[in-house]
């Protein structure tokens, strides 16, 4: 169908054929936009990861993705850029058209005219005009020291270079193909021009920062680049380093404008931000499921019918992912028995941070997915001005440089990130609070003496700090527009500013995710310790009960023998960490509740209590004294066995689908179980996880947790 359309109208500039831009059944592009959102978010993340790991990014102008931008931006794996040779003819055609129109005396914006509000000025010195354009746009400030922090991060610059090449390859901009080849050489040799961090409103594109790439290409004396080893290079040294011996470019008419008049810096940074955001969003769903496991939550909050009745796809998928993690979980099975045994031990319903986590995360996933597709459309767009339409022999004066999709998408993404962080903080706060966490110790303290172990108290304070800053960053950027450039640029997108703020938000969410994951691993190990200690206490109480309560002084069966079952119920129902640091203390609940059982049995013993040989009261002292001798030793032995890796009860996490993340933290990263008895601090362990998240090492463990999921909820039955 596309081929027939081409024959009918013949419109073709470069790599993008005009009929493809105007599909008859979808003239407004809504259908294409909707099509990109088909399938699950998990499948989309898997596709992103696969693309990110490919060794080559082939640019043709119309199929660049955010994952490819992220891959080139990091350069960690040595990914290379290749330009589609098929785009050369279209690029050359638009460049030739500009030169032809110049020779014919055609009046074209930015070619024979001034710029913006001063476009009423005229000149025939096209090359000199481009040189002046780059000079006056070099208005950024870097500061005199490396610590000044006024240079755009080099990853963002690399992303911008790639996106700008992709735009210019489409053949609507009037620039030579050779210039794009040189920018590609810079990328492939890891030589990155220095761009100012601030100074763009992303409305006539990212004029100021992009002018520094043009300055490097033209050899401006103030241009600097950074080499692969961090060395500072002048423009001449940069050209020599990448093997370009033909000298700097003398820009032809329109070429300077083609380089600077686009949204590549904002959309490039937005691409890297969204790649990370999609990974973190998926991680937040898994962390919510692990939170449900260690909190002994009720899994019915993931039931598909609940979410199907709400209709929102993000919510349905978030619930289905959590349902998959919890399905068959050993923690869930154990918690179910606990709830059946004592339904009044905790509230009938879990608190909102657990129970409504799919409803909370679902809309954020939807926002992130839509923003991802919006930015992918932007990085594959032609976004400068004027556009050269060779087929109709005209220059189109419009406003595709307006980066509103970037500003809006980044504002929305940042709000979604803040919401994810808010949920994470609420979950963390429940996890460390012994009033809410169903038997875990206060602050997740793992040591023997809680008076000398305050666990994650400092980490909770840090989480509050992270969350507060994240909520502040959620405020929109796009409502702070100022009229610029003599009121010509009177509305502007602030796309790069919003992207920068979203990059900050992503960094903070990484801090929160790493801290929360370390805390969850601590909680997993505490549940393991709890189970072993409870087992030890039960066995010890049972042994002591049999020795002291079964028979009387003459070997006859004693009425107190019937107390054992109720004594063991006390052990099952009492939170281990409420007494385990001093299990036989009279002020702790274990001894109080055990004595209460014996007293209650004694009160129902009737006339037998008057006889010393049948009195249960007479047995209490013997039971307690022997327990006080034996129990502390047994508890210490159980702790020692756990520390040496020979615990009597294995860690339930090994039977769970969430195990890959736990294994990654404990084994691959070496982040340890924390106690006040050790020197290691929480921050040191969180740092290991944070670094792994930043380096992308956590991606595989995340996907391993969801291996085998078919993309659908469990059937309703």
From Swiss-Prot:
* 2,3-didehydroalanine (Ser) PTM sites in chain numbering: 204
- Find the cross-link 5-imidazolinone (Ala-Gly): 203-205
Catalytic reaction equation(s): L-phenylalanine = (E)-cinnamate + NH4(+)
Q: What is its main location?
A: cytoplasm
The biological process GO terms on file are: cinnamic acid biosynthetic process; L-phenylalanine catabolic process
Active site at 109 (proton donor/acceptor)
**Which protein are we looking at?**
Phenylalanine ammonia-lyase 1
Species, as recorded: Prunus avium (Cherry)
Question: Which gene produces this protein?
Answer: PAL1
């Amino acid at each position: 169908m596309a081929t027939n359309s081409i024959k009918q109208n013949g419109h073709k500039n470069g790599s993008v054929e005009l009929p493809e831009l105007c599909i008859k059944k979808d003239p407004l592009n809504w259908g294409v936009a909707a099509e990109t959102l088909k399938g699950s978010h998990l499948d989309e993340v898997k596709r992103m990861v696969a693309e990110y790991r490919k060794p080559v990014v082939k640019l043709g102008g119309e199929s660049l993705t955010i994952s490819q931008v992220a891959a080139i931006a990091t350069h960690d794996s040595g990914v290379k850029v290749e330009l589609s040779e098929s785009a050369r003819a279209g690029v050359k055609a638009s460049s030739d058209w500009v030169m032809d129109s110049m020779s014919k005396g055609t009046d074209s914006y930015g070619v024979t005219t001034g710029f913006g509000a001063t476009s009423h000025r005229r000149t025939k010195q096209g090359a000199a005009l481009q040189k002046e354009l780059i000079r006056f746009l070099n208005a950024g400030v870097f500061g005199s020291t490396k610590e000044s922090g006024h240079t755009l991060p080099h990853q963002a610059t690399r992303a911008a270079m790639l996106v700008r090449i992709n735009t210019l390859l489409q053949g609507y901009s009037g620039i030579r193909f050779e210039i794009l080849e040189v920018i590609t050489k810079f990328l492939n040799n890891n030589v990155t021009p220095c761009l100012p961090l601030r100074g763009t409103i992303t409305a006539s594109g990212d004029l100021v920062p992009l002018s520094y790439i043009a300055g490097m290409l033209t050899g401006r004396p103030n241009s600097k680049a950074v080499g692969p080893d961090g060395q500072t290079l002048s423009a001449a040294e940069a050209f020599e380093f990448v093997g370009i011996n033909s000298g700097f470019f003398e820009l032809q008419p329109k070429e300077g404008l083609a380089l600077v008049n686009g949204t590549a810096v904002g959309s490039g940074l937005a691409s890297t931000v969204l790649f990370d955001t999609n990974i973190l969003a998926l991680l937040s769903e898994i962390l919510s499921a692990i939170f449900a496991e260690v909190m002994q939550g009720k899994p019915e909050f993931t039931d598909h019918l609940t979410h199907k009745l709400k209709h929102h796809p993000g919510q349905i998928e978030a619930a289905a992912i959590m349902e998959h993690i919890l399905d068959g979980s050993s923690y869930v099975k154990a918690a179910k028995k606990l709830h059946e045994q004592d339904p009044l031990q905790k509230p009938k319903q879990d608190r909102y941070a657990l129970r409504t986590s799919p409803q909370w995360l679902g809309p954020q996933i939807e926002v992130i997915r839509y923003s991802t597709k919006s930015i992918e459309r932007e990085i594959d767009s032609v976004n400068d001005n004027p556009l050269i339409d060779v087929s109709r022999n005209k220059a189109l004066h419009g406003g595709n440089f307006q980066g509103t999709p970037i500003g809006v998408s980044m504002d929305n993404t940042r709000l979604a990130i803040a919401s994810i962080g808010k949920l994470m903080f609420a979950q963390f706060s429940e996890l460390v609070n012994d009033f809410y966490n169903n038997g875990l110790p206060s602050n997740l303290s793992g040591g023997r003496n809680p008076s000398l172990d305050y666990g994650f108290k400092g980490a909770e304070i840090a989480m509050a700090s992270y969350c507060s800053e994240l909520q502040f960053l959620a405020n929109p950027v796009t409502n702070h527009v100022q009229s610029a450039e003599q009121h010509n640029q009177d509305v502007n997108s602030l796309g790069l500013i919003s992207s920068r703020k979203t990059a900050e938000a992503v960094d903070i969410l990484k801090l929160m995710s790493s801290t929360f994951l370390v805390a969850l691993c601590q909680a997993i190990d505490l549940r393991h310790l709890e189970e072993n200690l409870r087992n030890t206490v039960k066995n010890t109480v049972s042994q002591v009960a049999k020795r002291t309560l079964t028979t009387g002084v003459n070997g006859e069966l004693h009425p107190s023998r019937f107390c054992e079952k109720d004594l063991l119920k006390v052990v099952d129902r009492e939170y281990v960490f409420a007494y385990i640091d001093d299990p036989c203390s009279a002020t702790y609940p274990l001894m109080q509740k055990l004595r209460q059982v014996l007293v209650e049995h004694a009160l129902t013993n009737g006339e037998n209590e008057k006889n010393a040989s049948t009195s249960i009261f007479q047995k209490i002292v013997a039971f307690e004294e022997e327990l006080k001798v034996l129990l502390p030793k047994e508890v210490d032995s159980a702790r020692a066995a756990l520390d040496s890796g020979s615990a009597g009860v294995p860690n339930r996490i090994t039977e769970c689908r969430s195990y890959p993340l736990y294994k990654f933290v404990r084994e691959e990263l070496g982040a340890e179980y924390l106690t006040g008895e050790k020197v290691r601090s929480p921050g040191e362990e969180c740092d290991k996880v944070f670094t792994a998240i930043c380096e992308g090492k956590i991606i595989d463990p995340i996907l391993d947790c969801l291996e085998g999921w078919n993309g659908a909820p469990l059937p309703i039955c």
